[in-house]
């Protein structure tokens, strides 16, 4: 008896577009980042949210056969965003972009049992960037994540050197590095790297653009 074919879907949304899905993503974030990874984060009623989760923040939920498997958060960099505003000493202020063509990626994660879907979540991230006309994706990452990106063939640019960014619940020092994935100068390479994963991914973009919030792709 053959297994049912795997159906992968990425949904881009704002919390007003999908309130029930957003609660599920916030619960997933609490379980992954606070409970499993031990990050010291603000949680309430089983949910993880912070001041950067606003009505204008955009999200990706990665679903396999209708079940949530991963997510990321995207904030346009002409607005307040995590790495610049919550960690101001991690790099020179001039290093951080502040324009509509840069989108910060944060809360990027998969359940450990679904690490095989990492390529699919990256494919969704670069699809999102293409749809938004992004030139760069700033982020705060640990050194292991940075090395993983390089192994995949993804070029990154640091804004500064690795620095302590806090402690986990066990008191261990956490190190991070601020930087970006420059999109424009490696667009062709990224297209080749993720061509196949993107063909296997059904994408639904439920965000609505109007007025100054519209970004041409």
Language-model regions: role of each:
Residues 44-51, 161-167:
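Short, solvent-exposed loop/turn elements at beta->coil junctions and helix N-caps
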Residues 67-71, 103:
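Glycine-rich phosphate/pyrophosphate-binding loop shared by adenosine-nucleotide-utilizing enzymes
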Residues 82-183:
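Acyl-donor binding region in acyl/amide transferases
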Residues 50-61, 70, 79-82:
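A short helix-loop-beta-strand connector motif used in the catalytic cores of GNAT acetyltransferases and
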Residues 172-217:
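Long hydrophobic alpha-helical segments typical of transmembrane helices together
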Residues 2-48, 59-63, 68:
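Short amphipathic alpha-helix that is part of the acyltransferase structural core
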Residues 47-53, 144-147:
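Beta-rich nucleic-acid/ligand-interaction surfaces
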């Amino acid at each position: 008896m053959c297994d049912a074919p795997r159906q992968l879907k990425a949904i881009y949304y704002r919390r007003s577009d999908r309130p029930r899905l957003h609660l599920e993503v916030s619960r997933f974030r609490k379980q992954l980042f606070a409970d499993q990874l031990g990050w010291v984060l603000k949680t309430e009623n089983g949910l993880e949210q912070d001041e950067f989760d606003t009505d204008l923040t955009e999200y990706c939920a990665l679903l396999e056969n209708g079940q949530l498997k991963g997510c990321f958060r995207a904030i346009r960099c002409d607005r307040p965003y995590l790495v610049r505003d919550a960690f101001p000493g991690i790099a020179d202020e001039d290093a951080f972009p502040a324009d509509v063509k840069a989108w910060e990626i944060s809360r990027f994660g998969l359940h450990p049992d679904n690490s095989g879907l990492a390529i699919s979540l990256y494919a969704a991230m670069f699809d999102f960037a293409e749809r938004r006309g992004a030139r760069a994706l700033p982020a705060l990452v640990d050194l292991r994540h940075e090395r993983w990106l390089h192994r995949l063939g993804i070029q990154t640019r640091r804004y500064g050197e690795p620095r302590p960014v806090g402690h986990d619940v066990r008191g261990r020092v956490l190190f991070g590095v601020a930087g970006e994935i420059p999109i424009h100068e490696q667009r062709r390479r990224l297209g080749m790297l993720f061509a196949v994963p993107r063909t296997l991914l059904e994408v639904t973009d439920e965000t609505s653009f109007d007025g100054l919030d519209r970004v041409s792709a």
